[in-house]
Amino acid sequence: MWIGIISLFPEMFRAITDYGVTGRAVKNGLLSIESWSPRDFTHDRHRTVDDRPYGGGPGMLMMVQPLRDAIHAAKAAAGEGAKVIYLSPQGRKLDQAGVSELATNQKLILVCGRYEGIDERVIQTEIDEEWSIGDYVLSGGELPAMTLIDSVSRFIPGVLGHEASATEDSFADGLLDCPHYTRPEVLEEMEVPPVLLSGNHAEIRRWRLKQSLGRTWLRRPELLENLALTEEQAKLLSEFKTEHAQQQHKHDGQA
């Protein structure tokens, strides 16, 4: 997969190219990341990249010419088929389904805004899609871009150490992930659930699915509204609710 970055601070992306899962993907040739800074496309000695907005108001906008030239340079390097994405709080909110969609693209160009944003005409003429990582304000598009790169790269074959990891992540099937445990078996009198030590893979799968359903019901119930539960899932969720109610009753009785 090839990803082009348009950013005033391309050095920030060393966090992606040099470390962790994405760093290994770059090292192994599974992910290629190139960057272009609008500053390199300025024509004045101050390398100016911001300009005042028409109509007044606080803040500045990214200057049109350097930004467009940087995007054009990235498009030329990418060749045919590159999708241009602007990281914007006004875009579609990124979720696992969206990540899965974006991962089908072999070439992405990510435009990172700064200041108060970019000229609307640049969005209309150069941008294919706008994406957001949440309803809050950041100083620029670099962190959202890194979030997108990290999440999308997990779908590239060979990137993860275990091929099932991406499909078993939280949200991969519309549910939160189940609890996980490692050594020691007992930590401050808290024991690993016996089923995980049983070696019975069918029961382990059933337990994990029940916990995943239950955790989603407790923490993100709105996610269940969009799911058509199978007969097994409905039964497991019902069991979880009963067990949870019993635990709450026991806890209340001890309080």
Curated annotation (Swiss-Prot):
Keywords: Cytoplasm, Methyltransferase, S-adenosyl-L-methionine, Transferase, tRNA processing. Its main location: cytoplasm. It comes from the Bacteria. It catalyses: guanosine(37) in tRNA + S-adenosyl-L-methionine = N(1)-methylguanosine(37) in tRNA + S-adenosyl-L-homocysteine + H(+). Its EC number is 2.1.1.228. S-adenosyl-L-methionine binds at residues 113, 133-138. GO terms for molecular function: tRNA (guanine(37)-N1)-methyltransferase activity. Belongs to the RNA methyltransferase TrmD family. Homodimer. This is tRNA (guanine-N(1)-)-methyltransferase. It comes from Klebsiella pneumoniae subsp. pneumoniae (strain ATCC 700721 / MGH 78578).
